[in-house]
Swiss-Prot record:
The modification N6-acetyllysine is found at residues 76, 321, 327, 375, 382, 393, 459. Transmembrane segments: none annotated. Keywords: Acetylation, Methylation, Mitochondrion, Transferase, Transit peptide, Tricarboxylic acid cycle, Ubl conjugation. Homodimer. InterPro entries: Citrate_synth-like_lrg_a-sub (IPR016142), Citrate_synth-like_sm_a-sub (IPR016143), Citrate_synthase (IPR002020), Citrate_synthase_AS (IPR019810), Citrate_synthase_euk (IPR010109), Citrate_synthase_sf (IPR036969). This is Citrate synthase, mitochondrial. The modification N6,N6,N6-trimethyllysine is found at residue 395. It is an enzyme of class 2 (transferase). Oxaloacetate binds at residues 356, 428, 448. Pathway: Carbohydrate metabolism; tricarboxylic acid cycle; isocitrate from oxaloacetate: step 1/2. It comes from Macaca fascicularis. Belongs to the citrate synthase family. It catalyses: oxaloacetate + acetyl-CoA + H2O = citrate + CoA + H(+).
Length: 466
């Protein structure tokens, strides 16, 4: 309760009432996440039912021809509870900004970065957890982490030229054999119980993902060496970095930050929308998340931080490592004039510097201020936005999360760029699976939008203009 009160003071009266309401919903002394959900869900079901009865026919927005041909950009068509992306403020997790999460969410003993367990608790419940609640979640995931033997055998027999994301997707799909939801659905479980089985599967999957991801890493880059055993006294990120083979406490802190800030980014991005869509068919969390990972593997979604590193490396190769602002400016213009973009800058929704970039920059300033690659990234931060503004084409000239993450991973020795999207995937599970639980709890139906052909669209427009 003291933590909730502190949060209310930090966020002001606007959010204080929400925090007090959350405190009434579930005792801060309760550490069982499922029990808290069981209390929250009926209240939220009733609230939404009343809202729909009163406002179900209210028009939310208009759809244009350009939206239909342009990837549905800007089209309001989904309800997604766990996070909202504001063009100016960036992502808010259940109403909390990244700086607020960094301040309020529990941290490891001696650590400074938020624990992803706390972020998951927040995404699921809307409440800032206590240290005891986060500790319960760490131990619960450790208890559920063991992989079935057929998945281990599968991972060990993949060819080394199979992309890490393909391995992740296949292994998660194979975990479907363990699905509580699929089994219960086949036995005719009541719809009101769907969320409980989705919760169990989601908890199991999140617990097992670091083991899968670490095994992929060890098989591909560490000659198949063992990942070791899960330590129930360590947090989720610490166990993950141990299994990867990294013992630097700063790298573990980076991983806590990385897994927190990449967890969710509203519902319209490819991975979030895919899990939502596939889950609406009542596919279990393993199948839904595997589908999301196939979307994340696409170069337009999950490969951006690799593209940044490739561009930075090429820049250093062509103009040197200690480059003047003037030479850097010329190189940026050459990139743009050749028809290419500056990777790591711009965003489909954001119109300011991505707060996920900012917190990584702060981490670098604290832990690696003299690293040459970080200094180059910092130098670009001063120059690129002005060049893009001069060019006049970019709606958002500011850096996004991908402009920084790869540089930090490289500094601590993780140089295998093909693997970076796997880390992204492990993190993204927190957001999309939290939402999947709520999608089933709220009874969201099968997603089935109406499509039109170009011919049909032309006839429709003609009828409107005539």
């Amino acid at each position: 309760m003291a933590l909730l009160t502190a949060a209310a003071r930090l966020l002001g009266t606007k959010n204080a009432s929400c925090l007090v309401l959350a405190a009434r919903h579930a005792s801060a002394s309760s550490t069982n996440l499922k029990d808290i959900l069981a209390d929250l869900i009926p209240k939220e079901q009733a609230r939404i039912k009343t809202f729909r009865q009163q406002h179900g026919k209210t028009v939310v927005g208009q759809i244009t021809v350009d939206m239909m041909y342009g990837g549905m950009r800007g089209m309001k068509g989904l309800v997604y509870e766990t996070s909202v992306l504001d063009p100016d403020e960036g992502i808010r997790f259940r109403g909390f900004s990244i700086p607020e999460c960094q301040k309020l969410l529990p941290k490891a003993k001696g650590g400074e970065e938020p624990l992803p367990e706390g972020l998951f608790w927040l995404l699921v419940t809307g409440q800032i957890p206590t240290e005891e609640q986060v500790s319960w979640l760490s131990k619960e995931w450790a208890k559920r982490a063991a992989l079935p033997s057929h998945v281990v055998t599968m991972l060990d027999n993949f060819p080394t030229n199979l992309h890490p994301m393909s391995q992740l997707s296949a292994a998660v799909t194979a975990l479907n054999s363990e699905s509580n939801f699929a089994r219960a659905y086949a036995e005719g479980i009541s719809r009101t119980k769907y969320w409980e089985l989705i919760y169990e599967d989601s908890m199991d999957l999140i617990a097992k993902l670091p083991c899968i991801a670490a095994k992929i890493y060890r098989n591909l880059y560490r000659e198949g060496s063992g990942i070791g055993a899960i330590d129930s006294n360590l947090d989720w990120s610490h166990n993950f970095t141990n299994m990867l083979g990294y013992t630097d406490s700063q790298f573990t802190e980076l991983m806590r930050l990385y897994l927190t800030i990449h967890s969710d980014h509203e519902g319209g991005n490819v991975s979030a929308h895919t899990s939502h869509l596939v889950g609406s068919a009542l596919s279990d969390p393993y199948l839904s998340f595997a589908a999301a990972m196939n979307g994340l593997a696409g170069p337009l979604h999950g490969l951006a931080n690799q593209e940044v590193l490739v561009w930075l490396t090429q820049l250093q190769k062509e103009v040197g490592k200690d480059v003047s602002d003037e030479k850097l400016r010329d190189y940026i213009w050459n990139t743009l004039n050749s028809g290419r973009v500056v990777p790591g800058y711009g965003h489909a929704v954001l119109r300011k510097t991505d707060p996920r970039y900012t917190c990584q920059r702060e981490f670098a300033l604290k832990h690696l201020p003299n690293d040459p690659m970080f200094k180059l990234v910092a130098q670009l931060y001063k120059i690129v936005p002005n060049v893009l503004l001069e060019q006049g084409k970019a709606k958002n000239p500011w850096p996004n999360v991908d402009a920084h993450s790869g540089v930090l991973l490289q500094y601590y020795g993780m140089t295998e760029m093909n693997y970076y999207t796997v880390l992204f995937g492990v993190s993204r599970a927190l957001g999309v699976l939290a939402q999947l639980i709520w999608s089933r709890a709220l009874g969201f139906p099968l997603e089935r939008p109406k499509s039109m052909s170009t011919e049909g669209l032309m006839k429709f427009v003609d009828s409107k203009s005539g």
